[in-house]
């Protein structure tokens, strides 16, 4: 253990190859798929709406693989940006960069490799999708640095996590209609809300270390702010359903999602770390409920 109470692993050069690969797997959060799922669901919402059913299989493959690649790259650059902070935060002090098991240079190479593979996949799609991928890279790479300068990194995360939505419409339809931007807005609201649950877990550590978040900004009004965010998300998804002329299955999916969100408020009402983290994880089911509603609704036309 170091003087800061951080478990120190052997230097990267002393690790065996299986150990080193294990640390890289942890670096890209291969052991924690929740982030990929939270990125996958809105991407699939967009693909199914844009195609009015099952999207072209190659397009579906590119976006599904791209979700994992870009989310993994985002985790790497986030840990690189937070390597000064993570050793002092209970939840993050065992991350590979925080312990020294992976060096900063290695992390940057992993980030570049993941983004290059993702970009190579995008190059197989139309030119508009390729062009839209450029701001997507900027959003993913710049997000981790915002927590030093603004209390709204969760909003920016929503912009980054949802960028696959306009890209999906561009890939399938060759343009991004108003429906795509409405769905993008709904995702920004959703991601801001679920990542605020996540930020509530780290709030005490973030205050101590000078990091910023919506959880700190909202303070004692956090649950009220969360309610407003989820209500605005629901209202935007209602507009999506009306504009896309979706049937009963979609509205049933929205109803199920609303009940799932209500459960999150119930378990996190005392703002304890464990329940707030469970509320964050629970949003996977919210995304799934909305996707099932969309998929069944468009299949039944």
Curated annotation (Swiss-Prot):
EC number, as in UniProt: 2.5.1.39
Known role: Catalyzes the prenylation of para-hydroxybenzoate (PHB) with an all-trans polyprenyl group. Mediates the second step in the final reaction sequence of ubiquinone-8 (UQ-8) biosynthesis, which is the condensation of the polyisoprenoid side chain with PHB, generating the first membrane-bound Q intermediate 3-octaprenyl-4-hydroxybenzoate.
Pathway: Cofactor biosynthesis; ubiquinone biosynthesis
Chloroplast in keyword set: no
Residue spans crossing the bilayer: 34-54, 57-77, 108-128, 163-183, 221-241, 245-265, 279-299
Keyword Cytoplasm: no
PANTHER family (UniProt xref): 4-HYDROXYBENZOATE POLYPRENYLTRANSFERASE, MITOCHONDRIAL, PRENYLTRANSFERASES
Listed cofactors: Mg(2+)
Protein name: 4-hydroxybenzoate octaprenyltransferase
Lineage: Bacteria, Pseudomonadati, Pseudomonadota, Gammaproteobacteria, Lysobacterales
Molecular function per GO: 4-hydroxybenzoate polyprenyltransferase activity
Membrane topology: Multi-pass membrane protein
Alphabetized UniProt keyword annotations: Cell inner membrane, Cell membrane, Magnesium, Membrane, Transferase, Transmembrane, Transmembrane helix, Ubiquinone biosynthesis
GO annotation terms (biological process): ubiquinone biosynthetic process
Similarity comment text for this entry: Belongs to the UbiA prenyltransferase family.
Catalysed reactions, as listed in the record: all-trans-octaprenyl diphosphate + 4-hydroxybenzoate = 4-hydroxy-3-(all-trans-octaprenyl)benzoate + diphosphate
PROSITE patterns documented for this protein: UBIA
Cellular component per GO, a single term: plasma membrane
Origin superkingdom: Bacteria
């Amino acid at each position: 253990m170091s003087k800061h109470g951080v478990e120190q692993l052997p230097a990267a050069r002393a690790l065996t190859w299986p150990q080193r690969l294990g640390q890289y797997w942890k670096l890209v959060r291969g052991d924690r798929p929740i982030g990929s799922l939270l990125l996958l669901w809105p991407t699939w919402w967009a693909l199914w709406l844009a195609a009015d059913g099952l999207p072209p299989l190659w397009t579906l493959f590119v976006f599904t693989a791209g979700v994992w690649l870009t989310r993994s790259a985002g985790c790497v650059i986030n840990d690189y940006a937070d390597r000064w902070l993570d050793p002092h935060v209970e939840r993050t002090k065992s991350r590979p960069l925080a312990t020294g098991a992976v060096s900063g240079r290695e992390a940057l190479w992993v980030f570049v490799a993941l983004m290059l593979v993702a970009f190579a996949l995008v190059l197989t799609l139309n030119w508009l999708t390729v062009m839209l991928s450029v701001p997507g890279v900027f959003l993913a790479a710049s997000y981790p640095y915002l927590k030093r300068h603004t209390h709204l990194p969760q909003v920016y995360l929503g912009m980054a996590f949802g960028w696959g939505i306009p890209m999906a419409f561009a890939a399938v339809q060759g343009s991004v209609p108003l429906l795509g931007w409405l769905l993008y807005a709904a995702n920004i609201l959703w991601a801001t809300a679920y990542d605020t649950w996540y930020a509530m877990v780290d709030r005490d550590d973030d205050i101590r270390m000078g990091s910023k978040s919506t959880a700190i900004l909202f303070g004692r009004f956090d649950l009220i702010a969360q309610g407003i965010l989820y209500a605005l998300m629901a209202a935007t998804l209602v507009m999506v359903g009306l504009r896309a002329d979706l049937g009963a299955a979609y509205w049933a999916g929205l109803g199920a999602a609303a009940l799932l969100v209500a459960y999150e408020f119930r378990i996190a009402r005392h703002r304890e770390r464990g329940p707030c983290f469970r509320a964050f994880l629970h949003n996977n089911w919210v995304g799934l409920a909305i996707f099932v509603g969309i998929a069944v609704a468009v299949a039944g036309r």
